[in-house]
Amino acid sequence: VNAGSMADIAFLLLIFFLVTTTIETDSGLNRKIPPMEDIIDPPIIKERNIFTVVVNKNNDLLVEEKPMQIDELREAAVTFLDNGGGKGEDACSFCQGERDPNSSDNPEKAVISLKNDRETDYKVYIAVQNELVAAYNILRNREFARLNPNLGMSFVEADRKYSDPRTSLSQKESLKPKLSEVTVSYTHLTLPTTEYV
């Protein structure tokens, strides 16, 4: 039996399967995670400066150990971040909150901690993240408008413009310090934030 063409057939089948097979790509969140630091002792954070958000396996939201609806989370986060309850060097000059001594000192010291169960629905997890990012963006927009009243754009618009590859280098150089100044004030969400380099 002549088997000379068997290699050709096997090669053609291999080519056929390589061409017709689709390769699935993983989908997920595009987040920049902070690099590992060589700090041995963790920083001391006052309990009142931590805003804890927990999503359990039943998709129930607990904020500061109290049940809350997702649509109420943004306002609660803004209230916490903008409290400005610090005294002396911890005081916040730009905060417009209630200055409650039992809540955060200032946005630079405030930390939002998001924890979820493994069985939490992905869409609920994303909805909670979106509300927390929106709370930061509300405050960033307000502070950006206060510091740059003649610019005529919000922080989010300026950030989008800075990230756009079509934006000229001179415009990026102009936006960079303005964006960085606001970002420094509102950085301690446990979700990664944009770094302007």
Where are these regions (language model features)?
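Long, low-hydrophobicity, acidic/polar, solvent-exposed interaction domains
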Residues: 23-189
